[in-house]
Structure formats: structure tokens, C-alpha cells
């Protein structure tokens, strides 16, 4: 903090510890010396200068006598051992330095090593002496602090230190009387100067010393109430005369000052308002009533409790504000329908008459509901009981009874019944649940594959149409949820599941076939319903054989309950009737870029359908697919060539980058395209080289886990799987130009065969 320019520099007060000599000086002389030294150490330069100008002049003849020099030497010698002066002998100012008048003496300060005492005559020019001292300090490099005192004060100090010597000369009484008489005048002047200085300090704006003398003891008992909050509560004299007498506190009420009463502000307001006959009260009267009946709010509580009272008055609808005709005075009342007429006397009453000895400690007891309830059980005759209000905390809490079985807001997924061994292969809800492996020679019924990430589908061996539509697929992608059509607008068709690879690029009905070694074992499916190849959608499985492996694309035509495709623990497919072909996975799979040469047998839907014409060129609508050039037909991403119309991330079909996805997909139109069955018997089985087999032989475990994460229902026709982000961006531009709404002649016949199965 910057000091005021008018405020003089005040040195810090230091108490001088001066050892006493053997001889005791006179009391007047000692007091005179102490006053002089305190004045020397404390008063600033300019204050001393003004004081010295008012002092009586000293004759120059007395100052220029050689005895004066000797007296100065004697003063320095006497102060040196007594006041522990530093090695700064008293110096007489040289005459050749301009600005110093005659008679000026300089000596070292008794306690401050970097300061010197300057004794000047009373009539000398203080300003010229200060300038001369400043020039001398710059030239000689000595102490830069000078304390200017008058010669009269020095004589008093000299007399104080020479007191023992005067006593030895038997002149103690006369010298002390003269010294005491001479001290009266400078002492009075110093007191006046000090008083003037204190007045200047008190007048300063930066002075905060008065804060140390502040205390709250002088404040009155009602000083807290002296707040300007009567803006709307100024009661005129006539209204005060008509005001009913208010109820006074019960003398038996225990006045507790230390703790807060166990009542809410809402209850306190009701106590106050209901205490008057007219059941109305001004805001100021409410404050006064609460303070009179509960001293805690008067002496202990912070003033913010009044804000809480105003807040509760405005918050609750039961408190109504009424105004007089002149709108000068407003009262607070309680709504008649909400008024319970709750008063303090009703809440607190004596349980039994008590002796005065028992009554005295009860006055100090805090009226707490919890303490009263606990004490009422054990000592109901000795303690007062609180008539319970509604509980303070729970009075505004409405109990809500929740049912034991909470309502199901979303359709829950029915869990699949797995065997005891299938718990090892269970993954998360987004993973395919794969049954553990078992030997192919087991006579047990084969375990089947189930899904939790798609629609609930029963075991493939026991597929029923009424079980296909029980549950929706829970998708993890928001894009899937946005693309899903409403339930009432989509025909739900479910495709069978498989544990085949989910590499992100291939999901065709493809199998490994040994065409050269065992041409009779070429995996074919018959167009009739008696012998379908009910192999599930992802069919890149390894066929056990002795010769080289080839990749063949074979699609399933009809999925019936008579000839199910059974899937065992060791990932083996059994065709239970005409073609008992065993498919195993004995080797590991690899993840490599797929190599495709030609279309093989296109895929078909798992729903019952009829074979269509074979003269059409589109692989989606024809029974046979035309072979194409492997170079021109290559694409980095393939889509299925059957009824799985969605560009799966792991499909190996062709795709078109020309249009938007699903533009030509008449999902809400004729379902004939969905029910066109392709007969794979007439399509040639084309071979691929064995590198494709090595790609399928080593497959990572992640692909097996995500193997059937794609939907096997028609919902996936409108859903893009976004597990592979880079692939999903490519699939956004895929269009199915081969799907058109032609050939709608068989729709009625197909649906007439399909829909009765749900009954």
C-alpha cells in the first residue's frame, strides 16, 4: 500500500534496554532522559525541525566555548559505555563545508549502526542542515540516516547521564530540581506535537488503526434487527392500534440459543400466523415472533434465515398475500383449505406435571423431535413429549410403491437353450455362440448354432416358421436402427445361420470341393424339397478329402423341416438324407484377398419357394448363372449371388458402384424377388486354385467370433454392418441393379403357401 504524501515517515519504536549504574539518579532526571531518548529515536526529522524552531534560542557564546567541546566529548564518552554506542565518535562539523552553521554536533546512534545523531542549535536553518548532511553523505559515503535533535534536548540527555557525577559532587538536589523544571516545557511541547501527529493520522484516509479498537460488546442487543427491510411492512399508526395482541411465549417453553429448533421454515411461518386471532401477520411481525419464541434465530443464526422465510412465503401456495385498501400494508395469511391451524402450543405440551427440580434441567434441553421420540419410550413421565408434526423431511415425499416385476418396456431376447458344453463357446451378445467341438462319431444329437445378435432363430434342425418372428435383432449400430423399416411394413424372412468365416469380404454359400479326386461327391442341391442342401449362408467350409482343395460356390435352395442341415460340435454338416456329405474344419484359416473367377450356383432364400424360369440372364432371377471373365469380374468387395440382398461385409459377390444402395430394391413392393429360388443343380461347379483354399484353411479366432454377426433376415437388406468402417463406406455406393420388380406372377402362389405355416 502506498503511503500518503502528507503522512510523515515514522520510525519503528524500539525499547532501549539501558543498564543502571551503581548510583541511583533522581527520578525526575531519569524520566527526563527517557523522554528525550524516546523522542530522539521516534520522532521524524521534519517534526523535530518544526519543534526545534519553536524552542528557545541558545546563545552562540555558550556553544562556542571550549568547554562546550569538552562537554560534547564528555557526552560522547558518557553515552558510549552506557548506551553501547557504535564506534562513531562525536564529530564536530568542519568549518570549510558550506551549509553547516557553527555549533552543530554529529554523533553515532546508540542502537542503529547506519544512523547518526545531529545536534543543532535551536535557531539554525534545518533545511540547509539537511541539504548539507545529504551532500556530506554522498561525498564521504557514511551513514545515510540522520536524526536531528536540538541542543536543548542534548543538554537534557547530558544531564540525565551526568546525574551520578552530580550526586558525587553533592549537587544532586539542586541539579535535579533545575533539570526537572527545565524538562516541563519540552515535555509539554512534545505531548502537543504527539497529539497533533495522532490527529493527522486519524484524519488520514489510509488509517485503519481504529479497527483494532473495535469490539462488538458495545453493540446493543437489538442491533441485528436494525435492518432496512420494512419496504412493504411499514404499519401506519392506525393499523398498529387495531393490531391484535400477539401471543407471548409460553414460560415453560425451553429457550435454546445454541441449536436450531427442529421445525422447518414453513412450520415456523404457520406457528406465527396461527398465533394471531385474525390469522394474518406482516413479514416484520413474522420475523419478530420467530425471534421471540426461538432465540436461536435472534442471537445465533445468520441473517440469511430471513431470506429463507421470504422464499418459503413465495414458494408455497398455502401462503397468500393480502393488501389493505390503500395498498400500503401487506399481510400474509394461510389459505383456508390448506390451513391446519398448527400452533406452537399444539406441538409442544407437557406430558405430566413435573416438579421444579425436574423442570430446571428441562429448560436447557433442545426441543428435538428425534430426542423426544426416543425419550418418550423410556421416560414418558419425566420428560416433555413433542406432539409429532408430519415428519419434516418426509412430509413432502410421496411414497411410490414399485411393483415386484417391473414392466417390460422393450421386447426381451429369449435366451437359447445350450448344452452343458456350449457355455465355453458363448461370447457377448454381439458375438456368435459357437458350440464346442465333438467327434463326428458321436451318436448324440448334434448341437446347433444360435445367435443373440440377430433375430431369435431356433435350432436349424428344428426350424419352425412360427418361431422365426419372435424377436427383433438388437443392433449395435445407430445407422442400422435408422435404416430399419417399421415392423408393420416389412416381410420378415430369416436365413439360416452358420459359423463360417466373417472375414469382412466373403459370405457366399461356398464350400471346398474335390472335383478331381471325387467328382461324385460334388456338393449339389436338388431343386425338390425332399433333398435340399440346407447348408447355412456362410459356407466356406473345408471338406475332408485326400486330393487338392477347390473353392466352389453352392447355394441352398429349400430350407424345410424334413431335411435339416445338422451342425455338430466339431463344425460338421450332415445331410441326413440323399447326400450325406460331411464337412469339417480340420485346418486353420488364413485371411487373404479373395480370388474369384466365375459365378457358381447362386444363393437362395431359406423360405419355401418355387424354381423360376432359367432363361433370364440376371443371377438373382435365373436358375443358372452365366460364366464371366475372371479378370473383368474381379471386385475388391463381393456381394452374395442369392437372396441375401444386403452387401455384407464378408460377401464375395459382384457389386456395382454406379448408384445408391437399395435404389432398385423393391422391399415394400412385390416379394417375388425374395422368394425366387435358384436351382443350383444346373449351374456348373467351377473351380478355383488352391491358394483360395489356403486362405480358408487358416482363419483367425476373431473371424470365428464375428462369423455370423450379420443379419440373416430381410432386415439386413436395409442394414449395413459397420464393424468394418472402411468397408461400410464402400458399400454405401453399392446398388443392386439386378433386382427389378419383374416376374411378379408367382407372388400370390408363393405367399399362399408361405403364410399358412404361421397359423
Curated annotation (Swiss-Prot):
SMART domains linked: FH
Parts of the chain that traverse the membrane: none
GO biological process: DNA repair; G2/M transition of mitotic cell cycle; regulation of cell population proliferation; regulation of transcription by RNA polymerase II
Tissue-specificity statement: Localized to the animal hemisphere of early cleavage stage embryos. During neurulation, expressed in the neural folds. Later, expressed in the spinal cord and in the eye field. During tailbud stages, expression is still restricted to the neuroectoderm, predominantly to the hindbrain, the eye and the spinal cord. With ongoing development, expression is also found at lower levels in the branchial arches. At stage 35, expressed in the rhombencephalon and in the eye retina.
Gene Ontology cellular-component terms listed: nucleus
Keywords carried by this UniProt record: Activator, Cell cycle, DNA damage, DNA repair, DNA-binding, Nucleus, Transcription, Transcription regulation
Compositionally biased region (Low complexity): 601-612
Job of this protein: Transcription factor regulating the expression of cell cycle genes essential for DNA replication and mitosis. Plays a role in the control of cell proliferation. Also plays a role in DNA break repair, participating in the DNA damage checkpoint response. Promotes transcription of PHB2.
Protein name: Forkhead box protein M1
Species whose genome carries this gene: Xenopus laevis (African clawed frog)
